[in-house]
């Protein structure tokens, strides 16, 4: 993954960017849409290993609260952020968004929404709306599915092989997972009272990110097999290369949604 420990879609501002540069650019792209000002408080829902929190403190001089359900991630992020030279408040909590009830100025969520149960989508949007002040902003970064109508309208053919790969992802990589469509986010935003200011799709950027992850895994094949197994190695290569193909062909997409509380 590199020093950032970013494990979501990178953002390639230049053709010569490496994987880690693309992760920093992705965090900056998301944070830059929030209108952050020094002294604000930013909530990161599903903060991962702390990459976005670190950049938010360093570049935007804000107080940060990260929440995650992973004990390992929370411990790593705390240790990472403790090294920053700042007077701003930094918290990383082992907590779900359902339990968070403090007012914040801005919210960012990168690569967490995909893991939420569909029936909880409206609750999340309502919670975010409630936490923010008037004029507050949320940046939601999520992988997206498409409707059958979208495939027909855009001439995208989905083969039997593609359907089998979808079954593989659902069974072995993200059990029980279901991706939202752009239309779902639009409806959720409207229903909760948000204004959807911008939809920024990054499909090609994720294909490139997945290609780079696969290349890194291939380059360390023997080491990866030694600490896991040949079966796990092959499963992850199938996942990375298959998903890269899906993003290239437009079967799946990924987007950043800028939401404003009026």
Cite the ranges covered by each PLM segment:
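Conserved Class I S-adenosyl-L-methionine-dependent methyltransferase catalytic core
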Residues: 1-33
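Hydrophobic beta-strand segment of the Class I
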Residues: 30, 107-111
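Conserved class I S-adenosyl-L-methionine
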Residues: 39-46
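Conserved SAM-binding loop of SAM-dependent methyltransferases across substrates and taxa
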Residues: 49-60
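Conserved SAM-binding loop
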Residues: 77-78
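A short acidic, Gly/Pro-enriched loop at the edge of an enzyme's catalytic core
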Residues: 98-107
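A short glycine-rich, Lys/Arg-flanked "PGG" loop and its adjoining helix->strand segment in the class I
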Residues: 122-137
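Substrate-binding/catalytic lobe of Class I Rossmann-like enzymes that use SAM or dcSAM, i.e.
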Residues: 144-256, 260-262
């Amino acid at each position: 993954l590199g020093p950032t420990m970013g494990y979501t879609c990178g953002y390639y501002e230049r053709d010569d960017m490496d994987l880690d540069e693309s992760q920093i650019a992705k965090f900056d792209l998301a944070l830059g849409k929030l209108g952050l000002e020094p002294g604000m408080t930013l909530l990161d829902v599903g903060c991962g290993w702390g990459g976005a929190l670190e950049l938010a403190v360093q570049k935007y001089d804000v107080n940060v609260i990260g929440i995650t359900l992973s004990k390992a991630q929370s411990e790593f992020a705390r240790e990472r952020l403790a090294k920053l030279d700042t007077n701003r408040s930094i918290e990383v909590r082992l907590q779900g968004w359902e339990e968070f009830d403090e007012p914040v100025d801005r919210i960012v969520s990168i690569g967490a929404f995909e893991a939420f149960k569909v029936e909880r989508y409206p609750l999340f949007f309502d919670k975010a709306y409630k936490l923010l002040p008037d004029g507050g902003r949320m940046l939601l970064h999520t992988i997206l599915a498409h409707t059958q109508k979208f495939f027909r309208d855009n001439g995208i053919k989905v083969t039997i092989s593609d359907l089998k790969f979808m079954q593989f992802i659902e069974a072995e990589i993200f059990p029980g997972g279901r991706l939202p469509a752009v239309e779902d986010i639009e409806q959720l935003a409207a229903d909760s009272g948000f204004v959807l200011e911008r939809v920024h799709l990054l499909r090609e950027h994720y294909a490139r990110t997945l290609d780079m992850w696969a290349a890194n895994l291939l380059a360390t094949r023997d080491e990866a097999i030694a600490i896991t197994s040949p079966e796990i190695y092959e499963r992850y290569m199938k996942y990375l290369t298959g998903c890269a193909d899906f993003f290239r062909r437009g079967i799946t997409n990924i987007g950043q949604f800028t939401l404003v509380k009026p």
